[in-house]
Design a protein with these regions (language model features):
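Phosphate- and other anionic-substrate recognition elements at nucleic-acid/protein interfaces
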Residues: 1-8, 12-140
Length: 140
């Protein structure tokens, strides 16, 4: 689907955020949002600013595919987001996105210490890029 897609890597301290280009081809990192009472409002502002067509939220399933406490927290947060934004909200499996993001940052010469501030949004980029690639494949 053409248009800007937003993606969130939900966390208890920070929420990593990424957006796509208007063609829905490339994921681009945005500044992470501090988790807390204002997070949903901040995300709603980004939906408006970028005229997003949807919001993709990472669902942190366990490696066996089952849902644990983190997945339940992400589901609850996604439900709250859906009540605030006027676009579809979709939960997408995010297993290993943070690992992939850490690996990419390490290969770019970033240490764990210097990656801390950007890892959440880097994970959101991995999540969104995977989503965009899957959407393109299904459109073929």
């Amino acid at each position: 689907m053409p248009g800007v897609h937003l993606a969130c890597d939900f966390g208890t301290a920070r929420i990593g955020v990424a957006r796509s280009d208007p063609a829905g081809i490339l994921a681009i990192p945005l500044d992470a949002i501090a988790a807390g009472a204002d997070a949903i409002g901040a995300l709603g502002a980004l939906v408006s600013e970028y005229e997003a067509v949807d919001v993709i939220i990472g669902l942190p399933l366990k490696m066996d595919g089952s849902a644990g406490p983190a997945a339940e927290s992400a589901r609850a947060w996604a439900a709250m987001v859906a009540q605030v934004v006027d676009v579809p909200v979709e939960l997408v499996d995010e297993r290993l996105t943070t690992v992939q993001a850490q690996r990419g940052l390490h290969q770019a010469g970033r240490t764990v210490r210097t990656s801390r501030a950007v890892i959440d949004s880097a994970a959101a980029v991995v999540l969104l890029q995977s989503y965009l690639d899957a959407q393109r494949k299904s459109d073929l």
